[in-house]
Amino acid sequence: MKKGKLGAIVFGLLFTSSVAGFSKDLTKDNAYQDLNVIEHLISLKYAPLPWKELLFGWDLSQQTQQARLQLVLEEKPTTNYCQKVLSNYVRSLNDYHAGITFYRTESAYIPYVLKLSEDGHVFVVDVQTSQGDIYLGDEILEVDGMGIREAIESLRFGRGSATDYSAAVRSLTSRSAAFGDAVPSGIAMLKLRRPSGLIRSTPVRWRYTPEHIGDFSLVAPLIPEHKPQLPTQSCVLFRSGVNSQSSSSSLFSSYMVPYFWEELRVQNKQRFDSNHHIGSRNGFLPTFGPILWEQDKGPYRSYIFKAKDSQGNPHRIGFLRISSYVWTDLEGLEEDHKDSPWELFGEIIDHLEKETDALIIDQTHNPGGSVFYLYSLLSMLTDHPLDTPKHRMIFTQDEVSSALHWQDLLEDVFTDEQAVAVLGETMEGYCMDMHAVASLQNFSQSVLSSWVSGDINLSKPMPLLGFAQVRPHPKHQYTKPLFMLIDEDDFSCGDLAPAILKDNGRATLIGKPTAGAGGFVFQVTFPNRSGIKGLSLTGSLAVRKDGEFIENLGVAPHIDLGFTSRDLQTSRFTDYVEAVKTIVLTSLSENAKKSEEQTSPQETPEVIRVSYPTTTSAL
Protein backbone atom coordinates (compact mmCIF):
# COMPACT_ATOMS: atom_id res chain seq x y z
CA MET A 1 0.00 0.00 0.00
CA LYS A 2 1.30 3.43 -0.90
CA LYS A 3 2.46 5.69 1.90
CA GLY A 4 0.04 8.45 0.92
CA LYS A 5 -3.01 6.13 1.03
CA LEU A 6 -1.92 4.62 4.34
CA GLY A 7 -1.51 8.09 5.80
CA ALA A 8 -5.00 9.03 4.62
CA ILE A 9 -6.52 5.97 6.32
CA VAL A 10 -4.65 6.62 9.57
CA PHE A 11 -5.63 10.28 9.49
CA GLY A 12 -9.26 9.39 8.88
CA LEU A 13 -9.37 7.00 11.83
CA LEU A 14 -7.58 9.41 14.15
CA PHE A 15 -9.71 12.35 13.11
CA THR A 16 -12.95 10.40 13.52
CA SER A 17 -12.00 9.24 16.99
CA SER A 18 -10.93 12.69 18.13
CA VAL A 19 -13.42 14.95 16.39
CA ALA A 20 -15.79 14.97 19.34
CA GLY A 21 -13.26 16.67 21.57
CA PHE A 22 -11.37 18.47 18.87
CA SER A 23 -13.46 21.62 18.78
CA LYS A 24 -13.09 22.03 22.54
CA ASP A 25 -9.33 22.42 22.15
CA LEU A 26 -9.24 25.99 20.87
CA THR A 27 -5.47 25.97 20.32
CA LYS A 28 -5.61 22.90 18.11
CA ASP A 29 -8.79 24.06 16.39
CA ASN A 30 -7.26 27.46 15.59
CA ALA A 31 -4.11 25.90 14.16
CA TYR A 32 -6.14 23.43 12.11
CA GLN A 33 -8.22 26.21 10.55
CA ASP A 34 -5.13 28.37 9.94
CA LEU A 35 -3.50 25.43 8.20
CA ASN A 36 -6.53 25.27 5.90
CA VAL A 37 -6.11 28.98 5.10
CA ILE A 38 -2.43 28.52 4.28
CA GLU A 39 -3.15 25.47 2.14
CA HIS A 40 -5.75 27.46 0.20
CA LEU A 41 -3.34 30.37 -0.34
CA ILE A 42 -0.62 28.03 -1.61
CA SER A 43 -3.00 26.31 -4.02
CA LEU A 44 -4.42 29.63 -5.22
CA LYS A 45 -1.46 32.01 -5.40
CA TYR A 46 1.85 30.18 -5.01
CA ALA A 47 3.35 30.36 -8.51
CA PRO A 48 6.25 27.88 -8.12
CA LEU A 49 3.97 25.02 -7.02
CA PRO A 50 4.30 23.01 -10.29
CA TRP A 51 8.06 23.64 -10.23
CA LYS A 52 8.32 22.28 -6.66
CA GLU A 53 6.33 19.22 -7.70
CA LEU A 54 8.71 18.62 -10.61
CA LEU A 55 11.95 19.41 -8.77
CA PHE A 56 11.30 17.89 -5.34
CA GLY A 57 8.16 15.79 -5.76
CA TRP A 58 6.43 18.18 -3.33
CA ASP A 59 2.74 17.35 -3.05
CA LEU A 60 0.37 19.87 -1.47
CA SER A 61 -2.24 17.37 -0.27
CA GLN A 62 0.36 15.01 1.22
CA GLN A 63 2.24 17.78 3.01
CA THR A 64 -1.00 19.24 4.35
CA GLN A 65 -2.16 15.83 5.50
CA GLN A 66 1.13 15.28 7.30
CA ALA A 67 0.79 18.62 9.11
CA ARG A 68 -2.79 17.79 10.09
CA LEU A 69 -1.63 14.47 11.51
CA GLN A 70 0.94 16.25 13.64
CA LEU A 71 -1.80 18.46 15.07
CA VAL A 72 -4.22 15.58 15.67
CA LEU A 73 -1.65 13.28 17.28
CA GLU A 74 -0.64 15.88 19.86
CA GLU A 75 -3.18 15.51 22.67
CA LYS A 76 -2.91 18.99 24.14
CA PRO A 77 -0.70 21.07 21.86
CA THR A 78 0.68 24.40 22.92
CA THR A 79 0.66 27.36 20.55
CA ASN A 80 4.42 26.96 20.37
CA TYR A 81 4.01 23.39 19.10
CA CYS A 82 1.40 24.44 16.53
CA GLN A 83 3.64 27.23 15.29
CA LYS A 84 6.45 24.77 14.66
CA VAL A 85 4.09 22.55 12.66
CA LEU A 86 2.90 25.48 10.54
CA SER A 87 6.43 26.85 10.10
CA ASN A 88 7.86 23.50 8.99
CA TYR A 89 4.91 23.03 6.63
CA VAL A 90 5.75 26.21 4.69
CA ARG A 91 9.50 25.67 5.00
CA SER A 92 9.11 22.34 3.23
CA LEU A 93 8.52 24.34 0.03
CA ASN A 94 12.29 25.01 -0.10
CA ASP A 95 11.69 28.65 -0.95
CA TYR A 96 13.38 31.60 0.76
CA HIS A 97 10.46 33.83 -0.16
CA ALA A 98 7.96 31.46 1.45
CA GLY A 99 7.70 31.49 5.21
CA ILE A 100 5.76 32.46 8.32
CA THR A 101 6.71 34.92 11.02
CA PHE A 102 4.99 34.88 14.39
CA TYR A 103 4.11 37.33 17.13
CA ARG A 104 6.80 36.12 19.54
CA THR A 105 9.41 37.85 21.67
CA GLU A 106 11.45 34.84 22.79
CA SER A 107 14.91 34.81 21.24
CA ALA A 108 18.54 34.15 22.08
CA TYR A 109 21.94 34.84 20.61
CA ILE A 110 25.64 34.43 21.25
CA PRO A 111 27.72 37.54 20.36
CA TYR A 112 29.84 35.87 17.69
CA VAL A 113 29.55 35.56 13.93
CA LEU A 114 30.57 32.24 12.40
CA LYS A 115 31.29 31.41 8.79
CA LEU A 116 31.74 28.17 6.85
CA SER A 117 34.86 27.82 4.71
CA GLU A 118 35.09 26.20 1.28
CA ASP A 119 36.53 23.03 2.84
CA GLY A 120 33.86 22.69 5.52
CA HIS A 121 35.44 24.31 8.59
CA VAL A 122 33.64 26.85 10.78
CA PHE A 123 35.52 29.89 12.04
CA VAL A 124 34.78 32.87 14.27
CA VAL A 125 34.89 35.91 11.95
CA ASP A 126 33.46 38.56 14.29
CA VAL A 127 33.46 39.00 18.07
CA GLN A 128 31.05 41.48 19.64
CA THR A 129 31.95 41.14 23.32
CA SER A 130 34.98 42.04 25.40
CA GLN A 131 34.19 39.23 27.80
CA GLY A 132 34.72 35.58 27.05
CA ASP A 133 37.46 33.32 25.85
CA ILE A 134 36.64 33.14 22.13
CA TYR A 135 38.61 35.14 19.57
CA LEU A 136 38.79 35.92 15.88
CA GLY A 137 40.16 33.00 13.92
CA ASP A 138 39.10 30.30 16.39
CA GLU A 139 37.73 27.20 14.69
CA ILE A 140 34.56 25.74 16.23
CA LEU A 141 34.83 21.95 16.60
CA GLU A 142 31.85 21.06 18.82
CA VAL A 143 28.67 22.64 20.19
CA ASP A 144 27.33 21.12 23.42
CA GLY A 145 29.25 17.92 22.78
CA MET A 146 27.96 17.59 19.21
CA GLY A 147 30.41 17.68 16.31
CA ILE A 148 30.16 20.88 14.30
CA ARG A 149 28.93 19.18 11.14
CA GLU A 150 26.27 17.28 13.08
CA ALA A 151 25.25 20.50 14.84
CA ILE A 152 24.85 22.28 11.50
CA GLU A 153 22.80 19.42 10.06
CA SER A 154 20.50 19.49 13.09
CA LEU A 155 19.62 23.10 12.28
CA ARG A 156 19.53 22.89 8.50
CA PHE A 157 16.34 23.10 6.46
CA GLY A 158 16.05 22.64 2.72
CA ARG A 159 17.68 20.39 0.18
CA GLY A 160 21.28 21.13 1.19
CA SER A 161 22.24 24.13 -0.93
CA ALA A 162 25.06 26.47 0.08
CA THR A 163 22.37 28.96 1.15
CA ASP A 164 20.79 26.32 3.42
CA TYR A 165 24.12 25.69 5.12
CA SER A 166 24.82 29.40 5.50
CA ALA A 167 21.45 29.82 7.23
CA ALA A 168 22.18 26.85 9.51
CA VAL A 169 25.55 28.34 10.52
CA ARG A 170 23.75 31.61 11.43
CA SER A 171 21.38 29.57 13.58
CA LEU A 172 24.31 28.20 15.59
CA THR A 173 24.50 31.59 17.31
CA SER A 174 21.03 33.07 16.80
CA ARG A 175 17.51 31.67 17.32
CA SER A 176 14.10 33.30 17.34
CA ALA A 177 10.65 31.98 18.12
CA ALA A 178 9.36 34.50 15.56
CA PHE A 179 10.69 32.08 12.91
CA GLY A 180 9.42 28.96 14.66
CA ASP A 181 12.85 28.16 16.13
CA ALA A 182 13.38 26.28 19.37
CA VAL A 183 15.08 28.89 21.55
CA PRO A 184 17.86 27.82 23.95
CA SER A 185 18.88 29.51 27.18
CA GLY A 186 21.58 29.13 29.80
CA ILE A 187 25.08 27.99 28.90
CA ALA A 188 26.41 26.50 25.67
CA MET A 189 29.72 24.62 25.68
CA LEU A 190 31.92 25.27 22.66
CA LYS A 191 34.98 23.22 21.81
CA LEU A 192 37.38 25.18 19.64
CA ARG A 193 40.83 25.17 18.10
CA ARG A 194 43.06 28.22 18.32
CA PRO A 195 45.09 29.30 15.27
CA SER A 196 48.08 27.99 17.25
CA GLY A 197 46.54 24.50 17.26
CA LEU A 198 45.60 24.53 20.95
CA ILE A 199 42.23 22.85 21.57
CA ARG A 200 40.05 23.85 24.50
CA SER A 201 36.41 24.02 25.63
CA THR A 202 34.77 27.18 26.89
CA PRO A 203 31.30 28.06 28.22
CA VAL A 204 29.24 30.75 26.51
CA ARG A 205 26.05 32.28 27.87
CA TRP A 206 23.06 32.64 25.58
CA ARG A 207 21.76 36.23 25.64
CA TYR A 208 18.16 35.23 26.24
CA THR A 209 14.97 37.27 25.83
CA PRO A 210 11.90 35.57 27.37
CA GLU A 211 8.44 35.31 25.89
CA HIS A 212 6.20 38.24 26.86
CA ILE A 213 3.16 37.58 24.67
CA GLY A 214 2.39 34.22 26.21
CA ASP A 215 0.96 30.99 24.88
CA PHE A 216 -2.68 31.00 23.78
CA SER A 217 -3.10 27.46 25.13
CA LEU A 218 -2.83 28.95 28.63
CA VAL A 219 -5.43 31.61 27.85
CA ALA A 220 -7.95 29.36 26.09
CA PRO A 221 -9.30 27.64 29.27
CA LEU A 222 -10.11 31.08 30.73
CA ILE A 223 -12.35 32.11 27.84
CA PRO A 224 -16.05 31.96 28.86
CA GLU A 225 -18.11 29.49 26.85
CA HIS A 226 -21.15 31.77 26.51
CA LYS A 227 -21.18 34.31 23.70
CA PRO A 228 -20.74 37.91 24.86
CA GLN A 229 -23.72 40.19 24.40
CA LEU A 230 -22.96 43.28 22.31
CA PRO A 231 -24.96 46.49 22.01
CA THR A 232 -26.46 47.07 18.57
CA GLN A 233 -24.26 50.14 18.10
CA SER A 234 -21.30 47.80 17.61
CA CYS A 235 -22.73 46.76 14.26
CA VAL A 236 -21.79 50.19 12.91
CA LEU A 237 -18.19 49.00 12.66
CA PHE A 238 -19.22 46.20 10.34
CA ARG A 239 -21.46 48.41 8.20
CA SER A 240 -18.70 50.97 7.80
CA GLY A 241 -16.28 48.33 6.60
CA VAL A 242 -13.71 49.05 9.31
CA ASN A 243 -13.08 45.46 10.38
CA SER A 244 -11.16 44.15 7.38
CA GLN A 245 -10.58 40.41 7.40
CA SER A 246 -7.19 40.19 5.75
CA SER A 247 -4.70 42.14 3.72
CA SER A 248 -2.01 41.37 1.20
CA SER A 249 0.65 43.21 -0.75
CA SER A 250 0.41 43.77 -4.49
CA LEU A 251 3.00 42.95 -7.12
CA PHE A 252 2.95 46.67 -7.96
CA SER A 253 4.21 47.58 -4.49
CA SER A 254 5.88 44.66 -2.71
CA TYR A 255 9.59 44.28 -2.01
CA MET A 256 11.44 41.20 -3.26
CA VAL A 257 13.11 40.02 -0.04
CA PRO A 258 13.28 36.69 1.84
CA TYR A 259 10.49 36.05 4.33
CA PHE A 260 12.82 36.40 7.33
CA TRP A 261 14.41 39.71 6.32
CA GLU A 262 12.33 42.21 8.31
CA GLU A 263 12.59 40.25 11.58
CA LEU A 264 16.30 39.57 11.03
CA ARG A 265 17.01 43.24 10.32
CA VAL A 266 15.29 44.33 13.54
CA GLN A 267 17.11 41.70 15.59
CA ASN A 268 20.50 42.69 14.18
CA LYS A 269 19.85 46.33 15.07
CA GLN A 270 18.84 45.42 18.62
CA ARG A 271 21.83 43.14 19.21
CA PHE A 272 25.07 44.32 17.63
CA ASP A 273 26.46 45.74 14.43
CA SER A 274 28.63 43.56 12.21
CA ASN A 275 30.06 43.89 8.71
CA HIS A 276 29.16 40.22 8.29
CA HIS A 277 25.42 40.87 8.64
CA ILE A 278 23.28 40.55 5.54
CA GLY A 279 22.72 44.06 4.17
CA SER A 280 25.76 45.57 5.92
CA ARG A 281 26.86 48.88 4.36
CA ASN A 282 30.58 48.08 4.39
CA GLY A 283 30.47 44.34 3.85
CA PHE A 284 33.12 42.01 5.23
CA LEU A 285 35.77 42.33 2.51
CA PRO A 286 38.92 44.38 3.21
CA THR A 287 40.27 47.00 0.82
CA PHE A 288 41.83 45.48 -2.28
CA GLY A 289 44.90 47.74 -2.50
CA PRO A 290 46.36 51.20 -1.90
CA ILE A 291 43.47 53.67 -1.98
CA LEU A 292 43.64 56.56 -4.43
CA TRP A 293 40.13 57.90 -3.76
CA GLU A 294 37.37 56.97 -1.32
CA GLN A 295 33.68 57.71 -0.76
CA ASP A 296 33.64 57.44 3.03
CA LYS A 297 30.15 58.84 3.68
CA GLY A 298 26.68 57.82 2.64
CA PRO A 299 25.18 54.37 2.01
CA TYR A 300 27.69 53.27 -0.64
CA ARG A 301 31.17 52.12 0.26
CA SER A 302 33.32 52.98 -2.75
CA TYR A 303 36.97 53.58 -3.50
CA ILE A 304 39.62 53.41 -6.22
CA PHE A 305 42.77 51.35 -5.69
CA LYS A 306 45.86 50.81 -7.80
CA ALA A 307 47.20 47.46 -8.92
CA LYS A 308 49.70 46.11 -11.46
CA ASP A 309 49.12 43.27 -13.88
CA SER A 310 51.63 40.47 -14.58
CA GLN A 311 53.48 42.69 -17.07
CA GLY A 312 53.86 45.44 -14.50
CA ASN A 313 51.33 47.74 -16.13
CA PRO A 314 49.50 49.92 -13.57
CA HIS A 315 45.69 50.00 -13.42
CA ARG A 316 43.15 52.01 -11.48
CA ILE A 317 40.35 49.71 -10.30
CA GLY A 318 37.08 50.90 -8.79
CA PHE A 319 35.25 49.15 -5.95
CA LEU A 320 31.57 49.79 -5.18
CA ARG A 321 29.41 47.95 -2.67
CA ILE A 322 25.68 47.44 -3.27
CA SER A 323 24.56 46.21 0.15
CA SER A 324 20.78 46.09 -0.33
CA TYR A 325 18.02 46.98 -2.77
CA VAL A 326 15.76 48.10 0.10
CA TRP A 327 16.84 51.70 -0.34
CA THR A 328 14.75 53.05 2.54
CA ASP A 329 16.77 50.92 4.98
CA LEU A 330 20.25 51.64 3.65
CA GLU A 331 22.84 52.24 6.36
CA GLY A 332 24.49 55.65 6.29
CA LEU A 333 21.70 57.56 4.57
CA GLU A 334 22.43 61.28 4.83
CA GLU A 335 19.97 64.15 4.88
CA ASP A 336 21.02 65.39 1.42
CA HIS A 337 20.14 62.07 -0.22
CA LYS A 338 17.75 60.55 2.32
CA ASP A 339 14.88 60.36 -0.16
CA SER A 340 17.02 59.83 -3.26
CA PRO A 341 20.22 57.86 -2.58
CA TRP A 342 20.42 57.01 -6.29
CA GLU A 343 21.55 60.59 -6.93
CA LEU A 344 24.68 59.95 -4.87
CA PHE A 345 25.11 56.64 -6.70
CA GLY A 346 25.07 58.56 -9.98
CA GLU A 347 27.73 60.97 -8.73
CA ILE A 348 29.94 58.05 -7.71
CA ILE A 349 29.43 56.39 -11.10
CA ASP A 350 30.49 59.59 -12.89
CA HIS A 351 33.73 59.68 -10.91
CA LEU A 352 34.44 55.97 -11.44
CA GLU A 353 33.75 56.27 -15.17
CA LYS A 354 36.29 59.07 -15.43
CA GLU A 355 39.00 57.69 -13.15
CA THR A 356 39.02 53.87 -13.44
CA ASP A 357 39.88 51.12 -15.91
CA ALA A 358 37.38 48.61 -14.45
CA LEU A 359 34.85 48.33 -11.64
CA ILE A 360 34.26 45.62 -9.03
CA ILE A 361 30.71 45.54 -7.63
CA ASP A 362 30.46 43.84 -4.24
CA GLN A 363 26.91 42.46 -3.99
CA THR A 364 27.64 39.74 -1.40
CA HIS A 365 25.15 39.32 1.48
CA ASN A 366 22.41 41.29 -0.30
CA PRO A 367 18.81 40.67 0.90
CA GLY A 368 17.08 42.03 -2.23
CA GLY A 369 14.43 44.75 -2.20
CA SER A 370 12.79 47.02 -4.78
CA VAL A 371 12.78 46.07 -8.46
CA PHE A 372 12.66 49.71 -9.57
CA TYR A 373 15.60 50.66 -7.35
CA LEU A 374 17.50 47.68 -8.78
CA TYR A 375 16.70 48.84 -12.31
CA SER A 376 17.82 52.37 -11.44
CA LEU A 377 21.26 51.17 -10.34
CA LEU A 378 21.65 48.84 -13.33
CA SER A 379 20.72 51.69 -15.67
CA MET A 380 23.87 53.47 -14.50
CA LEU A 381 26.09 50.46 -15.13
CA THR A 382 25.47 50.23 -18.88
CA ASP A 383 25.43 52.25 -22.09
CA HIS A 384 23.03 49.90 -23.87
CA PRO A 385 19.65 48.38 -22.95
CA LEU A 386 19.70 45.25 -20.78
CA ASP A 387 17.03 42.60 -21.31
CA THR A 388 15.27 41.52 -18.11
CA PRO A 389 13.96 38.07 -17.13
CA LYS A 390 10.31 37.39 -17.84
CA HIS A 391 7.90 36.13 -15.20
CA ARG A 392 5.15 33.53 -15.19
CA MET A 393 2.48 34.73 -12.79
CA ILE A 394 -0.77 33.86 -11.07
CA PHE A 395 -3.48 36.48 -11.39
CA THR A 396 -6.48 37.27 -9.21
CA GLN A 397 -8.93 40.15 -9.17
CA ASP A 398 -6.32 42.08 -7.17
CA GLU A 399 -3.92 42.27 -10.12
CA VAL A 400 -6.77 42.97 -12.55
CA SER A 401 -7.95 45.89 -10.42
CA SER A 402 -4.40 47.28 -10.24
CA ALA A 403 -4.01 46.93 -14.01
CA LEU A 404 -7.22 48.87 -14.59
CA HIS A 405 -5.97 51.58 -12.24
CA TRP A 406 -2.70 51.95 -14.19
CA GLN A 407 -4.59 52.03 -17.48
CA ASP A 408 -6.81 54.85 -16.27
CA LEU A 409 -3.88 56.75 -14.76
CA LEU A 410 -1.83 56.66 -17.96
CA GLU A 411 -4.63 56.96 -20.51
CA ASP A 412 -3.94 60.61 -21.42
CA VAL A 413 -0.14 60.53 -21.15
CA PHE A 414 1.53 61.16 -24.53
CA THR A 415 4.79 63.01 -23.82
CA ASP A 416 7.79 62.65 -21.53
CA GLU A 417 6.70 65.80 -19.70
CA GLN A 418 3.26 64.32 -19.02
CA ALA A 419 4.88 61.07 -17.89
CA VAL A 420 6.95 62.95 -15.32
CA ALA A 421 3.89 64.92 -14.20
CA VAL A 422 1.93 61.71 -13.55
CA LEU A 423 4.64 59.30 -12.39
CA GLY A 424 7.31 61.65 -11.09
CA GLU A 425 10.79 62.23 -12.47
CA THR A 426 11.89 58.80 -11.31
CA MET A 427 10.36 55.73 -9.74
CA GLU A 428 12.84 54.87 -6.99
CA GLY A 429 15.62 56.22 -9.18
CA TYR A 430 14.56 54.69 -12.49
CA CYS A 431 13.82 57.49 -14.97
CA MET A 432 10.20 57.92 -16.01
CA ASP A 433 9.43 58.77 -19.63
CA MET A 434 7.22 57.46 -22.42
CA HIS A 435 9.21 54.22 -22.51
CA ALA A 436 8.22 53.64 -18.88
CA VAL A 437 4.61 54.59 -19.62
CA ALA A 438 4.50 52.13 -22.52
CA SER A 439 5.94 49.40 -20.29
CA LEU A 440 3.29 49.88 -17.61
CA GLN A 441 0.53 50.10 -20.20
CA ASN A 442 1.71 46.93 -21.95
CA PHE A 443 1.88 45.07 -18.66
CA SER A 444 -1.59 46.22 -17.65
CA GLN A 445 -2.94 45.09 -21.01
CA SER A 446 -1.17 41.73 -20.66
CA VAL A 447 -2.74 41.20 -17.24
CA LEU A 448 -6.21 42.04 -18.55
CA SER A 449 -5.77 39.86 -21.65
CA SER A 450 -4.56 36.96 -19.51
CA TRP A 451 -7.58 37.34 -17.25
CA VAL A 452 -10.05 37.39 -20.14
CA SER A 453 -8.43 34.37 -21.85
CA GLY A 454 -8.12 32.34 -18.65
CA ASP A 455 -4.32 32.39 -18.70
CA ILE A 456 -4.19 33.12 -14.97
CA ASN A 457 -2.50 30.05 -13.44
CA LEU A 458 1.19 30.43 -14.27
CA SER A 459 0.65 32.74 -17.21
CA LYS A 460 2.73 32.98 -20.34
CA PRO A 461 6.10 34.67 -19.59
CA MET A 462 5.94 38.46 -19.49
CA PRO A 463 8.27 41.20 -18.23
CA LEU A 464 7.64 42.15 -14.61
CA LEU A 465 5.60 45.36 -14.65
CA GLY A 466 6.18 45.45 -18.41
CA PHE A 467 9.84 46.51 -18.27
CA ALA A 468 11.37 44.21 -20.87
CA GLN A 469 14.60 46.20 -20.79
CA VAL A 470 16.58 48.34 -18.39
CA ARG A 471 17.41 51.41 -20.43
CA PRO A 472 20.66 53.33 -19.84
CA HIS A 473 20.44 56.34 -17.54
CA PRO A 474 20.42 59.57 -19.57
CA LYS A 475 23.17 61.17 -17.44
CA HIS A 476 25.17 58.56 -15.53
CA GLN A 477 26.69 55.52 -17.26
CA TYR A 478 29.59 53.24 -16.43
CA THR A 479 30.87 51.79 -19.72
CA LYS A 480 34.11 50.01 -18.77
CA PRO A 481 34.66 46.35 -17.77
CA LEU A 482 32.44 45.28 -14.89
CA PHE A 483 32.91 42.47 -12.35
CA MET A 484 30.33 41.48 -9.73
CA LEU A 485 31.03 39.52 -6.53
CA ILE A 486 28.11 37.28 -5.54
CA ASP A 487 27.46 34.62 -2.90
CA GLU A 488 24.87 32.24 -1.47
CA ASP A 489 23.40 35.01 0.71
CA ASP A 490 22.17 37.07 -2.25
CA PHE A 491 18.38 36.86 -2.33
CA SER A 492 15.54 38.01 -4.60
CA CYS A 493 16.74 41.19 -6.34
CA GLY A 494 20.17 39.92 -5.32
CA ASP A 495 19.44 37.00 -7.67
CA LEU A 496 17.91 39.22 -10.33
CA ALA A 497 20.77 41.72 -10.72
CA PRO A 498 23.50 39.17 -11.55
CA ALA A 499 21.07 37.30 -13.80
CA ILE A 500 20.48 40.45 -15.87
CA LEU A 501 24.17 41.34 -16.03
CA LYS A 502 25.22 37.81 -16.94
CA ASP A 503 22.51 37.15 -19.51
CA ASN A 504 23.35 40.40 -21.29
CA GLY A 505 27.11 39.83 -21.21
CA ARG A 506 27.59 43.03 -19.22
CA ALA A 507 29.59 41.68 -16.26
CA THR A 508 31.81 38.82 -15.17
CA LEU A 509 30.33 37.15 -12.08
CA ILE A 510 32.75 35.89 -9.42
CA GLY A 511 31.89 33.92 -6.28
CA LYS A 512 29.20 31.37 -5.45
CA PRO A 513 25.70 30.73 -6.87
CA THR A 514 23.03 33.03 -5.46
CA ALA A 515 20.22 31.81 -3.19
CA GLY A 516 17.67 31.16 -5.93
CA ALA A 517 14.73 33.18 -4.63
CA GLY A 518 13.34 33.87 -8.08
CA GLY A 519 10.08 35.77 -8.29
CA PHE A 520 8.16 38.66 -6.81
CA VAL A 521 6.84 38.32 -3.27
CA PHE A 522 3.39 38.84 -1.83
CA GLN A 523 2.65 38.95 1.87
CA VAL A 524 -0.63 38.08 3.52
CA THR A 525 -1.96 38.83 6.98
CA PHE A 526 -5.20 37.40 8.30
CA PRO A 527 -6.94 37.27 11.71
CA ASN A 528 -5.80 34.26 13.72
CA ARG A 529 -4.94 33.08 17.22
CA SER A 530 -2.03 30.88 16.24
CA GLY A 531 0.16 33.95 16.55
CA ILE A 532 0.81 34.24 12.81
CA LYS A 533 2.17 37.71 12.11
CA GLY A 534 2.54 37.30 8.37
CA LEU A 535 2.74 34.76 5.58
CA SER A 536 5.06 35.36 2.66
CA LEU A 537 4.78 33.48 -0.65
CA THR A 538 6.27 33.70 -4.14
CA GLY A 539 3.88 35.10 -6.73
CA SER A 540 5.83 34.46 -9.93
CA LEU A 541 8.50 32.34 -11.56
CA ALA A 542 11.32 34.36 -13.12
CA VAL A 543 12.46 32.91 -16.45
CA ARG A 544 15.91 33.75 -17.82
CA LYS A 545 16.91 34.16 -21.47
CA ASP A 546 17.83 30.49 -21.82
CA GLY A 547 14.47 29.41 -20.38
CA GLU A 548 15.85 28.41 -16.97
CA PHE A 549 14.14 29.42 -13.74
CA ILE A 550 15.97 31.36 -11.04
CA GLU A 551 13.91 29.69 -8.29
CA ASN A 552 16.06 27.14 -6.39
CA LEU A 553 18.75 27.24 -9.09
CA GLY A 554 20.07 30.72 -8.41
CA VAL A 555 22.58 32.40 -10.69
CA ALA A 556 25.91 30.64 -11.17
CA PRO A 557 29.07 32.74 -11.41
CA HIS A 558 31.36 32.70 -14.43
CA ILE A 559 34.21 31.95 -12.02
CA ASP A 560 33.53 29.86 -8.90
CA LEU A 561 35.34 31.28 -5.89
CA GLY A 562 34.80 30.65 -2.19
CA PHE A 563 36.64 31.41 1.04
CA THR A 564 39.57 29.30 2.17
CA SER A 565 40.18 28.39 5.80
CA ARG A 566 43.05 30.89 5.79
CA ASP A 567 40.69 33.63 4.58
CA LEU A 568 38.37 33.10 7.54
CA GLN A 569 40.98 32.31 10.17
CA THR A 570 42.93 35.49 9.50
CA SER A 571 39.83 37.59 8.59
CA ARG A 572 42.01 39.18 5.90
CA PHE A 573 40.47 37.21 3.01
CA THR A 574 43.86 37.32 1.31
CA ASP A 575 43.31 34.31 -0.96
CA TYR A 576 39.92 35.59 -2.07
CA VAL A 577 41.06 39.17 -2.69
CA GLU A 578 44.18 38.12 -4.61
CA ALA A 579 42.14 35.74 -6.75
CA VAL A 580 39.64 38.49 -7.63
CA LYS A 581 42.43 40.95 -8.45
CA THR A 582 44.13 38.36 -10.67
CA ILE A 583 40.88 37.76 -12.56
CA VAL A 584 40.31 41.48 -13.10
CA LEU A 585 43.89 42.31 -14.08
CA THR A 586 44.18 39.30 -16.40
CA SER A 587 40.97 40.35 -18.12
CA LEU A 588 42.26 43.91 -18.56
CA SER A 589 45.55 42.64 -19.99
CA GLU A 590 43.74 40.38 -22.45
CA ASN A 591 41.43 43.22 -23.49
CA ALA A 592 44.44 45.49 -24.04
CA LYS A 593 46.15 42.83 -26.13
CA LYS A 594 43.05 42.34 -28.28
CA SER A 595 42.74 46.09 -28.70
CA GLU A 596 46.36 46.33 -29.85
CA GLU A 597 45.85 43.54 -32.36
CA GLN A 598 42.80 45.25 -33.79
CA THR A 599 44.54 48.62 -34.11
CA SER A 600 48.00 47.39 -35.23
CA PRO A 601 49.14 48.52 -38.73
CA GLN A 602 47.75 46.27 -41.42
CA GLU A 603 49.36 45.53 -44.76
CA THR A 604 48.31 48.18 -47.24
CA PRO A 605 45.96 46.44 -49.65
CA GLU A 606 46.92 46.45 -53.30
CA VAL A 607 45.37 49.36 -55.13
CA ILE A 608 43.42 48.28 -58.12
CA ARG A 609 43.33 50.93 -60.79
CA VAL A 610 40.48 50.90 -63.21
CA SER A 611 41.09 52.36 -66.66
CA TYR A 612 38.15 53.65 -68.55
CA PRO A 613 38.27 53.75 -72.35
CA THR A 614 38.68 57.17 -73.82
CA THR A 615 35.70 58.23 -75.81
CA THR A 616 35.95 60.59 -78.76
CA SER A 617 33.26 63.09 -79.17
CA ALA A 618 31.50 62.96 -82.51
CA LEU A 619 32.12 66.04 -84.53
Swiss-Prot record:
GO CC terms, sorted: outer membrane-bounded periplasmic space
InterPro entries in alphabetical order: ClpP/crotonase-like_dom_sf (IPR029045), CPAF_PDZ (IPR041126), Tail-specific_protease (IPR005151)
Region of interest (Disordered), residue spans: 591-619
Pfam families tied to this protein: PDZ_4, Peptidase_S41
Any one GO molecular-function label of the UniProt entry: serine-type peptidase activity
SMART domains reported for this sequence: TSPc
CDD domains in the record: Peptidase_S41_IRBP
GO biological process, one term: signal transduction
Family label: Belongs to the chlamydial CPn_1016/CT_858/TC_0248 family.
Protein name: Protein CPn_1016/CP_0837/CPj1016/CpB1054
Organism: Chlamydia pneumoniae
Organism lineage: Bacteria, Pseudomonadati, Chlamydiota, Chlamydiia, Chlamydiales
